[in-house]
Amino acid sequence: MNTQHSKTDVILIGGGIMSATLGTLLKELTPEKDIQLFERLSQPGEESSNVWNNAGTGHSALCELNYTKEGKDGSVDITKAIHINEQFQISKQFWAYLIREGHIESPDKFIQSVPHMSFVKGEENVKFLKSRVASLQKNVLFEKMKISQDPEKINSWVPLMMEGRQSDEAIAITYDETGTDVNFGALTKKLIANLQQKNVGINYKHEVLDIKKLNNGNWQVVVKDLNTSNVMNYESKFVFIGAGGASLPLLQKTKIKESKHIGGFPVSGLFLRCKNPDVIHRHHAKVYGKAEVGAPPMSVPHLDTRFVNGEKSLLFGPFAGFSPKFLKNGSYLDLVKSVKPNNMITMLSAGVKEFNLTKYLVSQLMLSNEERINDLRVFLPEAKDEDWEVITAGQRVQVIKDTDKSKGQLQFGTEVITSEDGSLAALLGASPGASTAVDIMFDVLQRCYKSEFKSWEPKIKEMVPSFGLKLSEHEDMYHSINEEVKKYLNVK
């Protein structure tokens, strides 16, 4: 085993959408920095970013009902929906900039216009959906949203969903043509190809073994070349851990105080994938339903048109599975090894409190294929068993952490953890994840490059014209920027 030493300015751990985005931002803002990226697999974007390991929804709260809460008085709080949409607007602006400048090309290879729709059944749910739309339509970001209970209108949007449906059933559906399907794996590959052209060191089949703080304030990152078994010690001023499910174990190796009292619970996803081309081509939308009362946000059912390498696909899910692995290509010991003295109480507290999650997972694990098809028939009443197959999607590690309110709180969003001195950052969690990558990486830069960030703002505003402002509060700016975005990304 040979040990070598090398110095660099930035180390990115993980070859997914987060590291690719942060690397791209850094090369635009400070091109002189030396950057090294390490990925354990043989190519980028193969874990959570892979097209089959996520639903590819450009999360904009156009269809996801869990981003709007209903109050006891019937009012609907749209605060989170606006925030999620604003984050995706930032991503789209940055991608449009990269296309305009020629850094990446062929947007149709990673983003497609696919209408986003919400679908509910029952009088109470219909009432909620109407209130939701009435609240959202007042905001410029949601001005194109439509709602209908008319069977003929709904049939014109999603004919397959109306075939065989009972006419006396109370249903309502929303429709927003500005929705998108995003292949984050393809986008990741484009971003990393661009980084390679800018002399970023892209190292595949390299596994990070350890991360240690040095006396001089830098980090020592121990990396093993899986091709040769050589081990190299890298010294870096800044480290970003964007390794999906592996981020938590790597963060724990740093021993920073911010890594304490954080745990993770892995959940795997299963989808039904359509095998019948006729069915696939007769549906063109991402249709999100409503989770059962008490079920976790990850359980929201959706019927998704996908585009994979130019070919149209159709998925339904997710159904939860369980594996103690933190990555699809991980170890069965991942969960056990993540339990430390400093997070044991955190994990146990969550186990006691999260009865609904436990109940949901047990019920999901007991589902037969016939029962999964029955769930699909809520969306497609005439779905045939032989047209669908089960596929395993990616692993998600839900963050468990102590909060001011209590110990062991399960978190369903995306979490950025940074060291006190800003020399290290890690990304944990799941949805909305990739859709918000650009905004999240701006957050990382603001926290970790405080002294430089102000001087970067003119360039940032060139890349993302709305930076620092809320498009939801600047109607004219939104329309102006959106026209540019539509032109370069070729979306509606």
UniProtKB/Swiss-Prot annotation:
<comment type="pathway">
    <text>Carbohydrate metabolism; tricarboxylic acid cycle; oxaloacetate from (S)-malate (quinone route): step 1/1.</text>
</comment>
<keyword id="KW-0560">Oxidoreductase</keyword>
<keyword id="KW-0274">FAD</keyword>
<keyword id="KW-0285">Flavoprotein</keyword>
<dbReference type="GO" id="GO:0006099">
    <property type="term" value="P:tricarboxylic acid cycle"/>
</dbReference>
<keyword id="KW-0816">Tricarboxylic acid cycle</keyword>
<comment type="similarity">
    <text>Belongs to the MQO family.</text>
</comment>
<dbReference type="GO" id="GO:0047545">
    <property type="term" value="F:2-hydroxyglutarate dehydrogenase activity"/>
</dbReference>
<protein>
    <recommendedName>
        <fullName>Probable malate:quinone oxidoreductase 1</fullName>
        <ecNumber>1.1.5.4</ecNumber>
    </recommendedName>
</protein>
<dbReference type="InterPro" id="IPR006231">
    <property type="entry name" value="MQO"/>
</dbReference>
<dbReference type="InterPro" id="IPR036188">
    <property type="entry name" value="FAD/NAD-bd_sf"/>
</dbReference>
<dbReference type="GO" id="GO:0008924">
    <property type="term" value="F:L-malate dehydrogenase (quinone) activity"/>
</dbReference>
<dbReference type="Pfam" id="PF06039">
    <property type="entry name" value="Mqo"/>
</dbReference>
